Amino acid sequence: MPAIRLFDTAAGHEVLLESGDRPSMYVCGITPYDATHMGHAASYVAFDLLNRAWRDAGKDVDYVQNVTDVDDPLLERATATNVDWRDLAQSQIDLFQTDMEALNVLSPDHYVGAVESISLIVPQVERLVSQGLAYTVPGTNGEPDGDVYYDVEAAGKQSVAPDAWSLGSISGLSESEMLELFAERGGDPGRSGKRQALDPLLWRVARDGEPSWPGASLGDGRPGWHIECTVIAQKYLPAPFTVQGGGSDLIFPHHEMGAGHAYSLAGVPLARHYAHAGMVGLDGEKMSKSKGNLVLVSKLRAAGENPAAIRLAILAHHYRSDWSWTDEGFAAAKADLAAWRRALDHAPQGSAAALVEEMRAALAADLDAPAAVAAVSRWARQANDGGAPASAPDQALVRDAVDALLGVRL
């Protein structure tokens, strides 16, 4: 495997991943409801490619993924469907993991829930309060006192080191852009009593009808979204770890704020690099839970579709691109998969090594799966056109390499 280059969102350009012998990666996991839609699948397949590329290079990879197993959308769905939120979360986690296994996505070394991490999160929020980087907000309109918020302005001034975090370090967004996205993605810019509109929640004190946990000096409650990932990553990975991954909708506020929390707590960046997968639509429209147009992996599998074809349909698109799932694209992926499998019976002698090198070069160039897929398709056309009996060594090498590098089982 050549040296891997990856587009770093924070840097704004491709970078060479200098990860040593043990690269490390954290990919933000699902909030367990409506799993696993195609946007989820595309994101985890994308970072599975990086995991596979590193492993192909002979490296031991430390990979951590969380699951946001308590959060407002989950609680709202549980209430709407009259299901206990814990049962809903567990059923969706089980479904997600089954879907990932079907898609041949390598499992993380640590799959960590927010709930099980609360005892780790509480003292870290207390530290931020004691450092003067977090503060409590009085309740209004019947809300209780004591919600804890992160002071982004104070945090941005805590260090003048070249790698220090300040608001915008990861996203590169303007304040107006941040405010718009903050409101759309779970933030509360209009909350009374906050020092800055963009200050994110660290600890939500207990409310009637909501689950809560002991918070020591914070009072009973539950953690905010961003601090969960920060604490889990700092627990299980080195500081800084190699790559923080996720969908592009996580750049702001989630990854921006998580990076700030981490620097405030450890004095070093959370991650060396930030990489993000594009968004997936359906037939040209944004795919969203609110629109009810989610394409679910489990429903495709239940309809008898081959998970390898689903994965191949995803790999036809560069991981950073925004794209739409279409029947035509899926049909093309199924046709490609069939052609690849036929070609194994006609693998030309001496053809496999060059194909493997093409695939490796493509993945090393910012995980260019479409180029790798195109290389396999060219090889398959030549093999099928030739029609000769297969060379057993080439047949085996192609089958193993397509599985190891692209995660497509032939």
Swiss-Prot record:
Zn(2+) binds at residues 28, 229, 254. A motif ('HIGH' region) lies at residues 30-40. It catalyses: 1D-myo-inositol 2-amino-2-deoxy-alpha-D-glucopyranoside + L-cysteine + ATP = 1D-myo-inositol 2-(L-cysteinylamino)-2-deoxy-alpha-D-glucopyranoside + AMP + diphosphate + H(+). Gene3D superfamilies: Anticodon-binding domain of a subclass of class I aminoacyl-tRNA synthetases, HUPs. A motif ('ERGGDP' region) lies at residues 184-189. Catalyzes the ATP-dependent condensation of GlcN-Ins and L-cysteine to form L-Cys-GlcN-Ins. Belongs to the class-I aminoacyl-tRNA synthetase family. MshC subfamily. This is L-cysteine:1D-myo-inositol 2-amino-2-deoxy-alpha-D-glucopyranoside ligase. The gene is mshC.
